[in-house]
């Protein structure tokens, strides 16, 4: 109730009969017993815990995890190359928001001011979009991820955005992405992307 950003984001089924109450209690105890003072501030601890859970979930999901999770080592490399100290940071397929989290960490680690960046993104998957909202809210990162999950090709949440930094790990080699309905799209300045592969479409959208 205290965080308006998470309204309608968090699940409301914690009381459902099939949920293992003992397991839920163990999870609550785990978070409750963390010694915040010894390991950092509460936002940092909760953020790292959430990131750890995402990575473990990704391990279980295997190849399917690519839809929402990019390994932190890959994201760190992208961020360190671009060095987004200030300006508009954009990810058109933001997954769980890893690019934004690492950007914030980079700025903090280099003595920068996180308030000098503006974060924009979106994701088509409703669950993944909610994961990103939670990931950023936990860390206190302000972001515009659209009012709801949306397909970037068919419902661009930021059509007028002129981003200073674009970081993304799009679903490569995506087929059946709806090319036939976007033949005359104004984004295809360098040619119409092939119907069987969305890679060129992603590149042109970002450009």
Residue ranges and their predicted role:
Residues 1-85, 144-157:
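Non-catalytic, mostly N-terminal accessory regions of nucleic-acid modification and defense proteins
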Residues 17, 39, 121-125, 165, ...:
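Hydrophobic alpha-helical scaffolding
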Residues 21, 160, 196-200:
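Short, solvent-exposed loop/helix junctions and linker helices
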Residues 26, 64-67, 121, 191-195:
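Alpha-helix N-cap/helix-initiation motif
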Residues 64-168, 173-180, 184:
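Conserved S-adenosyl-L-methionine
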Residues 78, 129, 193-207:
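Conserved Class I SAM-dependent methyltransferase catalytic core
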Residues 178-198:
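Short, contiguous acidic/charged loop-to-helix segments that flank catalytic cores in large enzymes
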């Amino acid at each position: 109730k205290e965080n308006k950003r998470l309204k309608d984001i968090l699940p409301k089924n914690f009381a459902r009969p099939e949920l293992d109450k003992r397991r839920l209690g163990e999870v609550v105890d785990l978070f409750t017993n963390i010694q915040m003072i010894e390991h950092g501030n509460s936002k940092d601890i909760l953020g790292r815990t959430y990131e750890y859970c995402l990575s473990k979930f990704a391990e279980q999901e295997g190849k399917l995890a690519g839809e929402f999770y990019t390994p932190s080592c890959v994201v760190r490399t992208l961020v360190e190359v671009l060095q987004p100290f200030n300006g508009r940071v954009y990810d058109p397929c933001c997954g769980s928001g890893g690019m934004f989290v690492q950007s914030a960490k980079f700025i903090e680690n280099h003595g920068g001011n996180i308030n000098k960046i503006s974060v924009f993104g979106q994701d088509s998957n409703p669950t993944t979009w909610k994961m990103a909202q939670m990931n950023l809210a936990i860390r206190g990162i302000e972001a515009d991820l659209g009012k709801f999950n949306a397909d970037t090709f068919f419902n661009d949440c930021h059509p007028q955005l002129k981003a200073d930094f674009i970081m993304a790990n799009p679903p490569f080699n995506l087929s059946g992405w709806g090319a036939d309905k976007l033949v005359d799209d104004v984004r295809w300045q360098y040619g119409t992307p092939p119907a069987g592969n969305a890679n060129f479409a992603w590149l042109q959208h970002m450009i």
